[in-house]
Amino acid sequence: MPKLRSATSTEGRNMAGARALWRATGVKDNDFGKPIIAIANSFTQFVPGHVHLKDMGSLVASAIEEAGGIAKEFNTIAVDDGIAMGHGGMLYSLPSRELIADSVEYMVNAHCADALVCISNCDKITPGMLMAALRLNIPVVFVSGGPMEAGKTKLSDKLIKLDLVDAMVAGADSNVSDEDSAKIERSACPTCGSCSGMFTANSMNCLTEALGLSLPGNGSMLATHADRRELFLEAGRRVMVLAKRYYHQDDESALPRNIANFKAFENAMTLDIAMGGSSNTVLHLLAAAQEADVDFTMADIDRMSRLVPHLCKVAPSTPKYHMEDVHRAGGVMGILGELDRAGLLHTDVFHVAADEGGNLKSVLAKYDVMQTQDEKVKHFFMAGPAGIPTTKAFSQDCRWPSLDNDRQEGCIRSREFAFSQEGGLAVLSGNVAENGCIVKTAGVDESNLTFVGSARVYESQDDAVAGILGGEVVAGDVVVIRYEGPKGGPGMQEMLYPTSYLKSRGLGKACALITDGRFSGGTSGLSIGHVSPEAAAGGTIALIENGDRIEIDIPKRSIKLAISDAELNARREAMLARGPMAWKPIGRERYVSLALKAYAMLATSADKGAVRDRSKLED
């Protein structure tokens, strides 16, 4: 029987000092011997997805203590990618993922916690906590802050739904009046919560459901809705169930590495492809798999992308649906149910929502709205928006008049009526990206599935933005932004501003963009990121020159620089001849702090999840 980890600091006379300190935090005589459950919160007033999380730790703690545990809360940092975007702040976003993972590990191991509840929400916080949870391998439950309500406003007497991307595009579009731009800006992000489309934050919170580490509704229940309160309470109760199963019954199925195994990672990626999730999820799943010692690679993602249909289309891929609409259609469990009926899901995997002895199949039987007989579950998925601006959680209790069970023309489709039989993400490879790159096909217009154009090369995102807004980029160009990978940036910046500005100049369907950086979950269009190897690691993207012909063929999963092998080799030799300046951007001026330099020294390319190069840390 496993011994409580916390016994290390609570048992024996030699731990009298540690017990004295525990007592100073409120622990009583009869508490010693109970499991200590760490609550990793990520409250901050900088981020709308986290601004309402201040009291959530106390809510989870109340359920833990009622179930017989000791709850101790700590906080992590949280970077808002939207606020950090478009300037040097974005260099810190991806590196913050590793910092969050390390900080959770530090706190949990330093204090010998027995189990963990992760309160996350936005872009790098959920992945960072996920990496930590799989690294620690103690019982864990994830519960997120929930999505923001979609914005709504009237333009030309027509009511439209909005999100963050609409504000960015309108702000850069000279054809939009100052009045309309301001109106969109004020309406785009009306409430607390993670941005309202299928962007990175919501994608990752959905994937924790598919991995088996969070409760049904975690990815789709609105941050403002009163029903979300129960998710926090149940997370506290459920982590105690898992802790007792492991420490009292020696049941290792309660551990995250046995829940999030290879099959679960396949389920998560299947969901991601089916719902057209953010391309960043590929990066984060690859990183999490390494922490879990699961051999899940780009090759698996490529294989699955050819098999899984696109069953759920959400903003930014369409203005019609946002996360509140996904929830009304049954949320993640609704999509997983359709994937199961299509024979594309492993249902024999463990899940934190399953009763002892149960698995994902039993969870779907209860929570898939197309098969459940539970009226409470149906009521749960009818939770809707109030349309009232607020920063407060649980502030409203509005309901849709009915569920969206239309699997032919609704938000979630059956395989027969899929938005497309090709999934929402694809892995491309070729001499531009020998180790692969990612495109969110859900956001690509059918006319652009094949594209041939001339390279317009930029050594940084800043130069690309200036070039796009300055009229350098014209229809038919392939914008190449390099030296923005994990090592070369450093930090692998998101390229939402370049893609948004292409749209604002009417070039969204007339140009392609490729980069060793990454894209916001809000990106759509022919935007190809995660090019691996990156330029700073000797990738071919560093050898592309202005005017080169680049051929993109998504159906054939290829991306090619159309020059001879002899010419490519000559360019490589010329690059190597630059000596210490080889594989570095020419003429770029950028301040890189010591913290970012330390990150860059260990960073791998995107095909490895941009995690640390462990070979550099081995004895």
Swiss-Prot record:
Task: Tell me which Pfam families the record gives.
Answer: ILV_EDD_C, ILVD_EDD_N
Q: How is the cofactor bound?
A: Binds 1 [2Fe-2S] cluster per subunit. This cluster acts as a Lewis acid cofactor.
Any keyword Magnesium?
yes
According to the UniProt record, what class of enzyme is this?
lyase
> What's the cofactor?
[2Fe-2S] cluster; Mg(2+)
Keyword Metal-binding set for record: yes
InterPro entries for this protein:
Dihydro-acid_dehy_C (IPR042096), DihydroxyA_deHydtase (IPR004404), DiOHA_6PGluconate_deHydtase_CS (IPR020558), ILV_EDD_C (IPR056740), ILV_EDD_N (IPR000581), IlvD/EDD_N (IPR037237)
- Record GO terms (molecular function): 2 iron, 2 sulfur cluster binding; dihydroxy-acid dehydratase activity; magnesium ion binding
Binding of Mg(2+), residues: D81, D123, K124, E494
Name its pathway: Amino-acid biosynthesis; L-isoleucine biosynthesis; L-isoleucine from 2-oxobutanoate: step 3/4; Amino-acid biosynthesis; L-valine biosynthesis; L-valine from pyruvate: step 3/4
An example GO biological process term is: isoleucine biosynthetic process
Catalysed reactions, semicolon-separated: (2R)-2,3-dihydroxy-3-methylbutanoate = 3-methyl-2-oxobutanoate + H2O; (2R,3R)-2,3-dihydroxy-3-methylpentanoate = (S)-3-methyl-2-oxopentanoate + H2O
Q: How does the record describe its quaternary structure?
A: Homodimer.
- State the protein's purpose: Functions in the biosynthesis of branched-chain amino acids. Catalyzes the dehydration of (2R,3R)-2,3-dihydroxy-3-methylpentanoate (2,3-dihydroxy-3-methylvalerate) into 2-oxo-3-methylpentanoate (2-oxo-3-methylvalerate) and of (2R)-2,3-dihydroxy-3-methylbutanoate (2,3-dihydroxyisovalerate) into 2-oxo-3-methylbutanoate (2-oxoisovalerate), the penultimate precursor to L-isoleucine and L-valine, respectively.
Q: What is this protein called?
A: Dihydroxy-acid dehydratase
**Which organism was this protein described from?**
Shewanella putrefaciens (strain CN-32 / ATCC BAA-453)
Per the record, the gene is: ilvD
